[in-house]
Amino acid sequence: MSDVAERVKKIVVEHLGVEEAKVTENASFIDDLGADSLDTVELVMAFEEEFSVEIPDDAAEKILTVKDAIDFITANS
């Protein structure tokens, strides 16, 4: 697993308070991990801070799963 993937998963575990085992690449932040809209905004902000990357609103709306976050960060950092 890549460094980016590990760091994304760590942020998700910390922000959503879910078990690490539940944070799979295909896990949906809302449907599988119980996030609400505020949680998703906070996750995006945490990703921006951790990876020093800007995630525009239109891109943030498309980041629905752990893999979406990993792919965006990998492509833009």
From Swiss-Prot:
The keyword Cytoplasm applies. The keyword Amino-acid biosynthesis does not apply. Keywords: Cytoplasm, Fatty acid biosynthesis, Fatty acid metabolism, Lipid biosynthesis, Lipid metabolism, Phosphopantetheine, Phosphoprotein. Pathway: Lipid metabolism; fatty acid biosynthesis. It is found in: Cytoplasm. GO terms for biological process: lipid A biosynthetic process. One of its GO terms (molecular function) is acyl binding. Residues 2-77 form the Carrier domain. GO terms for cellular component: cytosol; membrane. Belongs to the acyl carrier protein (ACP) family. Carrier of the growing fatty acid chain in fatty acid biosynthesis. This is Acyl carrier protein. It comes from Paramagnetospirillum magneticum (strain ATCC 700264 / AMB-1) (Magnetospirillum magneticum). The gene is acpP.
